[in-house]
Amino acid sequence: MALSPSVVPQESKEDNANCVETKPSQTTSIASEDPLQNLCLASQEVLRKAQQSGRSRCRQCGGSRMFYCYTCCVPVGNVPTEQIPCVQLPLKIDIIKHPNETDGKSTAVHAKLLAPDSVNIYTYPCIPEYEGKDHEVVLVFPGPQSISIEDVSFHLQKRIESKGRNKADNLDVPPRKLKRTTDEEGWDLHESTRQGPELKRVVFIDSTWSQTNQIASDERLRELLQVELRTRKTCFWRHQKGKPDTFLSTIEAIYYFLVDYHSAVQKEKYRGQYDNLLFFYSFMYRLIKNARGSGEKAKPQLVQ
């Protein structure tokens, strides 16, 4: 579970055949009945059929699961891969999962299933190397030093300028002999400082609140700019008792960060491009909501 704030836009009827634009009023308060009703989603008929037929075997590990295998991050046998939407993201997503987080209860796997080319999941203490990249990587996590998404570009620019000043202070090294710093993806510090701020990667923590500080305070993440989603509220069915409704599940945090980034940083009108990140989440939300509404006992083992 990620710990950042957010509300949920909403999903359209008739399997969301038409994309409904999310209006500001829909993203700043929770709809009382269905906060996910206006999302622009692919057909969920494949999930309805899978839910009716019951658990199926994972094609890779053979485990019995509902909808997807949370261990292998793949759909199970009765959910054809070609019927699962694939979402293209503008940023790379790294999810740091606490080793004690229960895989079957985490929504982090939703992101990997739906945006496999952009999402990586690491189990703590395994954390990617971010040293020297704090001007293009942010951590989504609430705290006293956290900023809003609207201020991300400003603070990244300040970090770039700081690096530029440090470079200029190195008077003993001729500019042509300064070391060019690159990584396997072609990352180049000197090129990026010339081009201005560009966010490339976002880090999320997948953990219960009581376990998050161990990861957030890790020295490998300590220097990253912290971003908080302050206007969003969760509708997660496993919301932690006693915690504010601005603490989101992991998939909610990823989704709302991208929606806000699209509008506030890229300055483009949001038209549902990332709504399918909630493809599994919205379906499971309704299953549990309907079960509770009809007096049935909601099944916590839905995907376990």
UniProtKB/Swiss-Prot annotation:
It is an enzyme of class 2 (transferase). Residues 180-193 have a biased composition (Basic and acidic residues). Keywords: Nucleus, S-adenosyl-L-methionine, Transferase, tRNA processing. One of its GO terms (biological process) is tRNA modification. A motif (DXTW) lies at residues 206-209. Signal peptide: none annotated. It is found in: Nucleus. This is tRNA-uridine aminocarboxypropyltransferase 1. It comes from Mus musculus. The gene is Dtwd1.
